[in-house]
Regions:
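Long, low-complexity intrinsically disordered regions
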Residues: 1-195
Length: 195
């Protein structure tokens, strides 16, 4: 494979040239649907398309919230309850957007075999699901959608380390058991995903 041709192809299909940059939520949806799946942010060492790169070009994600690329954040959050794509931390437990046409193929590769009420118990018994992840999942099964602060409290993980709770959320997302469905104005930052 000619590496220069490969790089040119990537730049074009990842929408990196300035004239191909995405400028609207509808163009973002089209981008995801054409690619099948994209990362939300660029992932170091992984040459796959990302929404950020398709909007802002091939430069690092800016820390400043006024960077033009951060418009992707609003597009993603605004679409969580619209069911226009499947968004969760899936590939490498990183934020991934999957076309609804392709999502069933990803799900088929997961370790879900039948019933959402039973699969997690099998995973727990086999040691593939932590106690914390089990508590989070059971809380959502019993309580329905909750923002992360209320979910943490209801799952009796208020005293758990942040990393333990966040890992539980990531594991459940990566296995297609939960996904964010909205954003609540909760917590110190007035920003909390609803699962």
């Amino acid at each position: 494979i000619d590496l220069k041709k490969l790089q040119t192809h990537r730049e074009r299909t990842f929408n990196q040239p300035p004239q191909r940059r995405l400028a609207s939520p509808s163009s973002a949806l089209k981008f995801v649907n054409i690619r099948g799946f994209v990362y939300f942010w660029p992932i170091k060492g992984i040459d796959l398309p990302s929404l950020w790169t398709a909007v802002a070009g091939n430069h690092p994600v800016a820390d400043k919230h006024d960077d033009p690329g951060h418009i992707t954040w609003g597009w993603k959050d605004g679409a969580l309850d619209k069911r226009i794509w499947y968004y969760a931390k899936i590939l490498r437990k990183k934020a991934t957007m999957i076309s609804l046409d392709v999502a069933p193929y990803f799900y088929a590769l997961s370790e879900n075999y039948g019933s959402p009420d039973e699969d997690y118990l099998l995973a727990y018994e086999e040691g593939r699901l932590t106690q914390s992840a089990k508590q989070v999942y059971e809380t959502l099964l019993n309580e329905g959608a909750l923002n992360t602060l209320d979910l943490r409290k209801a799952a009796k993980l208020s005293n758990a380390k942040d990393s333990e709770f966040n890992k539980a959320l990531e594991v459940l997302q990566a296995d297609f058991k939960i996904l964010p469905v909205g954003v609540a104005q909760a917590g110190a930052w007035k920003y909390s995903h609803i699962y």
